[in-house]
């Protein structure tokens, strides 16, 4: 079968498998490709290549498949640490997740941790695959495990009572040994994923935002800021705000340039130069953003979920304590911040993931789910995501 070209006519959704080690995440991924994509065997997926995201090495396997309704990009990680890093750095963006839980074991520590991470990094929806049901003879026991999973999801503010739970066996699907818990369950799972995981809003439909990378002054024309449009559209003549680092100011975009050509608008993904009215060369700087007025506010204090690199990953060699003051790299610039550890946590070791509170020395344009790198003198020592804004 020849390689079919990527069909753009279906909505595209990014998903991934999460759950405890050995509960069957990779087998399930293989089983889904068997019925909905180009079949990838367990070993092909398990030998996940390493990639770098925000200076951190992560092993992730990517597979693609499609249902009649959608095209999916699916990520599966070999090790628990890879999941933690992946979800925090957003190396593989997840619009939804399939939580794989063994019916024989029920929820285990990493089941809980992955649900917590999904909550912290803002995975919008979860569908559950209760795997290895052929290892449980007792229907009541199966019901008990399902109840446990629902309670666990609810305890992390997911709608545990409404989340679809599909019971089956990834192995039965791979081995064609029992159609009901094999192929049928996989098809039922994907129908649930189609129905329950919402299609993400395309970046172009969101309010305009441009992280400023550079500032120039062009004699006779004024000040130009450059960068890649993160989301939305900006049209010539529109009013925008400059947010972050200094007090918010309003200006008007009087021109948009791309590859030295004048355009009437710039949109998500474009690298543009935007000419802005009435702003001097030193009235704007790298690290600020241009955005639709009122859409983004500057903040200093936030709660973050962070992963701290190990020594082997090029990170710190020693733990850190409350009042640790690294730089936080948001979009295009470093800002110093003061870290406060949660009550009862005395120190954070390299390799830990942790929820901390941060206060920056200057405000930065930020929203929940914004990702950042933690740096010391230009060297990445961690990665994080804004879990919630305090002020």
Swiss-Prot record:
Domain tr-type G positions: 10-201
Can you list the GO cellular component terms from the UniProt entry? cytosol
In which compartments does the protein localize?
Cytoplasm
Q: Does the keyword Cytoplasm apply?
A: yes
Which Gene3D superfamilies does the entry mention? P-loop containing nucleotide triphosphate hydrolases, Translation factors
Tell me which residues bind Mg(2+). Answer: 26
> Catalysed reaction(s)?
GTP + H2O = GDP + phosphate + H(+)
What coarse category fits the chief subcellular location reported for this protein?
A: cytoplasm
Q: Which residues bind GTP?
A: 19-26, 76-80, 131-134
Segments carrying the region annotation (G3) are 76-79
Q: Which domain of life is it from?
A: Bacteria
Region (G4) location: 131-134
Q: Which UniProt keywords apply?
A: Cytoplasm, Elongation factor, GTP-binding, Hydrolase, Magnesium, Metal-binding, Nucleotide-binding, Protein biosynthesis
In the Enzyme Commission scheme, what number(s) does this protein have? 3.6.5.3
Disulfide cysteine pairs (residue numbers): none
Instruction: Provide a Gene Ontology MF annotation, just one.
Output: GTPase activity
UniProt region (G1), positions on chain: 19-26
Instruction: Tell me the segments the record calls region G5.
Output: 169-171
Q: What are the start and end residues of every segment in region (G2)? A: 55-59
Functional summary from the UniProt entry: GTP hydrolase that promotes the GTP-dependent binding of aminoacyl-tRNA to the A-site of ribosomes during protein biosynthesis.
Family, per entry: Belongs to the TRAFAC class translation factor GTPase superfamily. Classic translation factor GTPase family. EF-Tu/EF-1A subfamily.
Q: How does it assemble?
A: Monomer.
Please state what the protein is called.
Elongation factor Tu
Which organism is the protein's source? Rhizobium johnstonii (strain DSM 114642 / LMG 32736 / 3841)
